[in-house]
């Protein structure tokens, strides 16, 4: 689990997301509180429940990007889901319980990777011995059994040295590796994913663990053998228990587009993909026990972060019980022209940096001037104001249109320097931006 302070988390988010300081502070505090809770004594720790967050803001201002970056920083089981994909229990579609099952699967995968990494040094030693056994087979007694030698032979030590120095990397050997499990694809209706995964596991285990001889270069064989030996050193039962503990104590669920499951206006009959989903989310957020293929998972201390644009619906349109379980409200601000300028230049992998790198592969050197950046930002903001406001996503549309000609002719422009300034941007975009009908369809 991440031990970063709130200030460090915000600083890391600042490298990728412009503005939205309130949202960054809220998620940073929530993440740090996970660590603080684990420092408490057992009795008090059980009483401290997470303060779930509701992020409200127009589309394209950074709600989903905060979730993506948070997943990398958290070093904890994390899953992002779309609220619109679920239906009420009893109807065709995914049930909300599958959120916890998917989160547990992600945790098992994460814990397995950590366990394999922890055992990598020992696995490398075992893989090395298996390759040496192929290169220099150990001596056998009269009954065909391998004799245990007190000291490795001089030849074995010489080959070990060559192996470690990479002198034997390109030599081909034939080695026995675990055969891939039998692949069985089972198609089932939505909502029955749990049953299909159990059937697949059953079929895969039918054949047992078989060995298959393969001819490989030593450097390729070494990678496969390390993975195989590391997997043998991992205890599956311990791994499952560690994964369940990680989900229960540190798990984070990000629910996007929650405004799309708000009930709109007066309607009769069951609303299975809106209010029904909200009712099903209640026990998860409040705390319940969900059955997964790895074991029972309690959701009492899982942190839920919900987000939505709320352009048509309002947060008060959520059912009152769910509103009460999302106590921290954070409003994200609409982006201005100066925000667009910063988005184009400040993030570590801004879209201007990406375009420059892509064109550099063809030998074309692109240079964006300050005046060019300013004009691109103004054009994006202008189109957002005159048509539909889609936030920072408009920059991708505008820049793609601006770079279209260069991207098409890049292979013929090798070795050239192209400067994108205000005049260049105006020449290529002004006519489109000014014509509202054209910008509505093209930008």
Curated annotation (Swiss-Prot):
The name this protein goes by in its record: ATP-dependent protease ATPase subunit HslU
Purpose: ATPase subunit of a proteasome-like degradation complex; this subunit has chaperone activity. The binding of ATP and its subsequent hydrolysis by HslU are essential for unfolding of protein substrates subsequently hydrolyzed by HslV. HslU recognizes the N-terminal part of its protein substrates and unfolds these before they are guided to HslV for hydrolysis.
A Pfam family: AAA_2
Record annotation: effect of changing residue 393 to A: Complete loss of activity
Membrane-crossing residue ranges in chain numbering: none
Mutagenesis / variant outcome for changing residue 92 to G: Partial loss of protease activity
Gene designation: hslU
One Gene Ontology biological process: protein denaturation
Lineage of the organism: Bacteria, Pseudomonadati, Pseudomonadota, Gammaproteobacteria, Enterobacterales
InterPro entries linked to this entry: AAA+_ATPase, ATP-dep_Clp_protease_ClpX, ATPase_AAA_core, Clp_ATPase_C, HslU, P-loop_NTPase
Cellular component annotations (GO), alphabetically ordered: cytosol; HslUV protease complex; membrane
Conditions for induction: By heat shock.
Highest taxon of the lineage: Bacteria
Gene3D superfamilies, per database record: 1.10.8.60, DNA helicase RuvA subunit, C-terminal domain, P-loop containing nucleotide triphosphate hydrolases
This protein's UniProt keywords: ATP-binding, Chaperone, Cytoplasm, Nucleotide-binding, Stress response
Complex formation: A double ring-shaped homohexamer of HslV is capped on each side by a ring-shaped HslU homohexamer. The assembly of the HslU/HslV complex is dependent on binding of ATP.
Reported effect, residue 80 to T: Some effect on protease activity
Matches recorded under HAMAP family: HslU (MF_00249)
Record: residues binding ATP: 18, 60-65, 256, 321, 393
Keyword hit for Chaperone: yes
Coiled coil: none
Family: Belongs to the ClpX chaperone family. HslU subfamily.
Result, substituting residue 93 to A: Almost no protease or ATP hydrolysis activity
Subcellular location: Cytoplasm
UniProt xrefs under PANTHER family: ATP-DEPENDENT CLP PROTEASE ATP-BINDING SUBUNIT CLPX-LIKE, MITOCHONDRIAL-RELATED, ATP-DEPENDENT PROTEASE ATPASE SUBUNIT HSLU
GO MF annotation terms: ATP binding; ATP hydrolysis activity; identical protein binding; magnesium ion binding; peptidase activity; proteasome-activating activity; protein domain specific binding
Temperature dependence: Optimum temperature is 55 degrees Celsius.
């Amino acid at each position: 689990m991440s031990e970063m302070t709130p200030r460090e988390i915000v600083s890391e988010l600042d490298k990728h997301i412009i503005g939205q300081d309130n949202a960054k502070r809220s998620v940073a505090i929530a993440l740090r509180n996970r660590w603080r809770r684990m420092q408490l004594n057992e009795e008090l720790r059980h009483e401290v429940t997470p303060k779930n967050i509701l992020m409200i803001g127009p589309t394209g201002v950074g709600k989903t990007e905060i979730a993506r970056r948070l997943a990398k920083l958290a070093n904890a089981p994390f899953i992002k889901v779309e609220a619109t994909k679920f239906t009420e229990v009893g109807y065709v579609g995914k049930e909300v319980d599958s959120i916890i099952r998917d989160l547990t699967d992600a945790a098992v995968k994460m814990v397995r990777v950590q366990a394999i990494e922890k055992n990598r040094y020992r696995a490398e030693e075992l893989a090395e011995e298996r390759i040496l056994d192929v290169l220099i087979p150990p001596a056998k007694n009269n009954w065909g059994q391998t004799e245990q030698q007190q000291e490795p032979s001089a030849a074995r030590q010489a080959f070990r040295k060559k192996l470690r120095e990479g002198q034997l990397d390109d030599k081909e050997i034939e080695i026995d590796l675990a055969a891939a499990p039998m692949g069985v694809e089972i198609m089932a209706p939505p909502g029955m994913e749990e049953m299909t995964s159990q059937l697949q596991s059953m079929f895969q285990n039918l054949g047992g663990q078989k060995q298959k001889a393969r001819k490989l270069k030593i450097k390729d064989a070494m990678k496969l053998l390390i993975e195989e030996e590391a997997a043998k050193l991992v205890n599956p039962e311990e791994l499952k228990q560690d994964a369940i503990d990680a989900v229960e104590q540190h798990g984070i669920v990000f629910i996007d587009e929650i405004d799309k499951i708000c009930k709109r206006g007066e309607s009769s009959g069951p609303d299975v993909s809106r209010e029904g989903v909200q009712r099903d989310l209640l026990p998860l957020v409040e705390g319940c026990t969900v059955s997964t293929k790895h074991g029972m998972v309690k959701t009492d201390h899982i942190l839920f972060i919900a987000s939505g644009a709320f352009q048509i619906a309002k947060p008060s349109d959520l059912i009152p019980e769910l509103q009460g379980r999302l106590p921290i409200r954070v409003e994200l601000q609409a982006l201005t022209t100066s925000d667009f300028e910063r988005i184009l230049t400040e993030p570590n992998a801004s879209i201007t940096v990406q375009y420059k790198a892509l064109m550099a592969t063809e030998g074309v050197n692109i240079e964006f001037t300050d005046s060019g950046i300013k004009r691109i930002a103004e054009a994006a903001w202008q189109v957002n104001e005159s048509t539909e406001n889609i936030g920072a996503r408009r920059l991708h549309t505008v820049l793609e249109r601006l770079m279209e000609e260069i991207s098409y002719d890049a292979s013929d422009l090798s070795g050239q320097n192209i400067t994108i300034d205000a005049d260049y941007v105006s020449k290529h975009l002004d006519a489109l931006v000014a014509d509202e009908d054209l910008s509505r369809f093209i930008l």
